[in-house]
Amino acid sequence: RQSSNFFYLTGINNPSMLLIITKISSRHSTTLVCDRPNDIDKIWHGQLPSKSFYKNEFEIQNVLYSDELNSLELNDAKNMYFEFADENRLNQFIENLNLSQPQSRYLRNNTSRSTKIDLSNILFDMRRIKSKSEVSLIRHAAKISANAHVNIMKSCKSGLKEYEVEADFIKHCMSERCEQAYPAIVASGKNACVLHYTKNNSTLRSNSLLLVDAAAEYDNYASDITRTIPISGKFNEFQKKIYEIVLKAQTMAIKACKPGKTLIDIHNVAVKYITKGLIEAKILTGKLERNIKEE
């Protein structure tokens, strides 16, 4: 999968690329470094895009092939911003670019003399504010995910394997040109108590519950949905009571999502209501504050 930061800055999904943004006084320029197309790559992967394609399609000012990297003047840079400033990770990153030895040496030499600054937090702050088009992509991914969840709710039954449910979910997403946002958790019965259960190989049993944490990703924008459903198609009274506690907590947490609120503020709203509900259901004992503190 493409680096989210690289995709955010370029919109490009192709691998083995380097984006260099330079600023001299008030002037700045962008340079994309990519592999030179060759006949072997064409046989294995198809025709690679040309320089003009990247310039025109993605509005990149300059495009260099990796064997032309030393034509780019980097040795006067006082500060260099990387997605990571750790020396070992930087060296590993350069190695993963599959450059020739002279080009790798050139890049290492010209980065070693500069002050390295971690760019990731700056990019995270930028990415936190979504444009209308980004919100639209996320909504689309969420809609596909929701439909896939509804689909498996309808087809779920005793005797199926967890991986069959997962396959059904993936099939629906792929039919809508979506990938998986993360490895699916499809956990029936006690498996749902394992926070990151990924074996997905148990058999679904009547009167048990099935937890599905799975979601679609569309054009590198992800959704994230978790739902718990009755395998038999209907909750018993106890299951229904717990479900309603969780549903109400979710509704209250969503209402708490307002400007100025932090994630921990919203988390605490849900925790307080769930804890209160579990005490009333006699699953937890003791005072509300004490249970929350020990959570």
Set out the residue ranges of the language-model regions.
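Active-site neighborhoods and metal-handling regions in enzymes and metal-associated proteins
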Residues: R1-E295
